[in-house]
Amino acid sequence: MLPPTVLAASVLKDPLTLFLAGLSLLVLFLWYFATDYEARKRNIGTVLLVGICALCALAIYPPKDNLKGGIDLVGGSSFTLLVKPKIDEVTLQPIPLTKDDLKQARATIEKRVNAYGNIDMLAVEQGTDKILLQMPGMAPEESAAIKELLQKVARLELKEVNLEGGVPGSDGRPLAERIHTGDEPRVPGFKVYEQKYKNEDGTELSTYLLLNNRSALTGKDVQQAWPDSMAGGHSVSINLTNAGADKMIALTKDMTPGRDRIAVVLDGEVITAPVVQSVPLGKRFQIEGQDSQEEARSLANAMMNPLENPLEIIEERTISPTLGAAVVKQGMWSGIMGLCITAVFVLIYYRTAGLVALFGLLVNGLLIFGGMAMFNFTFTLAGIAGMILSIGMAVDANVLIYERLREEIAAGKSLKTAINAAYEKAFTAIFDSNLTSLITAVILYWMGSSSIKGFAITLTIGILASMFSAILVTRVLFRWCNDLNLLKKLSFLDLIKASKIDFLSKSKLAYVISGLLVAASVGAVAMRGENSMGIDFTGGSLVEFQLGEEKSLSQPEVEKALAGIQVSKRPIVQVEKSITGELVTIRCATGDADKIAAHLRGSFDILGEKETEDGKDRYVIEQSTQGVSATLGKDFLIDSAIALALGLLGILTYITIRFEFSFALGGFIALLHDVVLSAGLVILIGGELSLIHVGALLTIAGYSINDTIVIFDRIRESLKSGEGDVKELMNEAINATLSRTILTSLTTIVTVGIIAIFGGSALKDFSVMILIGLVIGTYSSVFIASPVVLWWSQRKGGSLRKEVLHTSLAESDIQAIR
């Protein structure tokens, strides 16, 4: 009998059970915010907390099955795919491959295998006719499904059936069958296809059809394909594009209902050839006969991403992690150390309230890991570092609440009243800052490539977990403490005293400093050119040494040997295993390939060993070198730029609605400033931009806008309630949030700094950029964003106070959902 936890986890794999559980929790969530009765709100919140935590825990259990590591952590499988030429429909001759064919095949593979961005995979063009695909470790059934999906061309064609092919000859056999057996000559412009089917007792039979060589419609005319259940079986429903619908009408308008037929051909096989029942046909039809819903889903996925050229898996290998075990362990421990230091700081600074915050952070972590397990995400080291960072940043919401709580207690309010007031006043800042990040995440998912989609889902899970743990979890815990009289009073350290700094008067100096830094960054990019981009962006060469079954080299040995060589770009080393033995591969810049190969032959005897053949010396272990494409090409950069631009536009629109256009402009310029400087300064200090930096930049963008919104929220509050000069009120608001700004930045910088120092080279690039972004983001929120708001409002001659009052949403609109 299965253990209860395993049984419960297996039950939750059922979609209906998961849907009902989610629906129940949603009802509780809405009920929690709808009720005003404190005791009821406390009880509903408790049930909701326990339910969501239980759901996440069961999604994670057992961790070894549900928390899957990426290529960098656990290695995986490597497939070498041969891209075959397609056949000309008229001449039936192979069409030579082009670079565009290889590019299309690679893009299609990425969309098929990683449509949601939840898998850590690598796909690069190799040579002139191959694609190298690497994926994290998979179960045998998953590997078999991936292989089938990779080689399924899903080339859909609709062809007119020549009815003469069914006319029987003197021997009683139809014309199409006699052509197939060679007893009749071919009919020009037509080709014989075999259609397989099963009779009533399950015996497989064949019939032959004479079809037009030219396809009336192809997969390019498919707008949408999805699995559909039908009585007695499964099918794939297809919607055609407008152009495809026009072709279908042109094909069928002159047909005779009840007589003429159309054949649906998939990958050269006739799936069905129904008799047309009415004319003309329109946009939608079905392909029937799939044996299971999963088969129908796989076919629909392939048809939405059809290959122009057939693929063949010519080699499969097991690959080592791109990071060694010691490096992975080092990175993990550094992250845990950073979080522990943050936890100790929160406990010392906020004391009893710090315990409540830590409980909220533990729930936050559980929700993030549970969400990742539910979406079947693979965990990379950078992803884990990003989650550690997001948990560290989740401290921000607690700091916001506690700094408000400090103010309310200082104003002489009772503890219960002070707690309620603190949550009420901090809510708008938490809501606005998280919602702007959520807008960005949605747009990134909608517009981005698979890698960007993965980041967007991770960001969304982190945002929702952070809001839930800060607003609901800690609030419920405080309610229990109050109702059970466990909490008599709260005290905090007060290391950051109230200040009266005139930040806005220093804006001109800040503009000069930022201008010089931007100029230096742009200059560094211009001077270094392509050298500022890593292999992920530029592509390069793949150097391979086939060691065979008797010889071996470890990944750390090769990496250590390459550490002492001067190269233009950092190489990426992997050790792969196949039935022919070990293979050492190095992805490097094209100009570094020969230098790296020579250095390795001089460093390892097994690579430098020679033998004499026909009077000539040759290496026992030969090397092969061939070009590989960028893992992040121009399309990725264009998609990312468009997604980021739309995300900025979404933020601009939201801040304009919630605040005023002056605030939107200030936030936009500060965000752009932070992203440009973070990337530019990394290049300026000699770094190379790679895939890991893309995630870092997106994280910085989210942190930056979050920091800015918190200050904007306090400025808005001051303008609504305070009298006096606008500039003075803005300075007071910035000073009021200074303790929160410093505390949040400090805790996050400590966490990331420890990862940078002790996390090893694997995490150095990621954490250094994050550190730069944190410092710049904190600086710009105070010295760039707010001064731009004041400058723009003064430039157009309006009253910022009146504009805020007119354009802000009514507080009751937000209060209603608390």
Which residues make up each language-model segment?
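Extracytoplasmic
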Residues: 205-319, 326-327, 331-332, 556-621, ...
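Hydrophobic alpha-helical transmembrane segments of membrane transport and translocation systems
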Residues: 370, 407-428, 432-517, 758-818
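Pore- and gate-forming transmembrane helices of large, multi-pass membrane proteins
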Residues: 109, 322-340, 393, 413-449, ...
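Cytosolic juxtamembrane regions of multi-pass inner-membrane proteins
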Residues: 392-433, 479-486, 687-744, 790-805
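Small-residue-enriched core segments of transmembrane alpha-helices in multipass membrane transport
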Residues: 45-56, 355-376, 387-394, 455-470, ...
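Transmembrane helices with small-residue packing motifs
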Residues: 29-38, 46, 50-76, 80-92, ...
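Interfacial segments of transmembrane alpha-helices in multi-pass membrane proteins
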Residues: 29-43, 237, 241-258, 262-263, ...
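Non-transmembrane, solvent-exposed regions of membrane trafficking/translocation machinery
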Residues: 89-275, 285, 634, 654
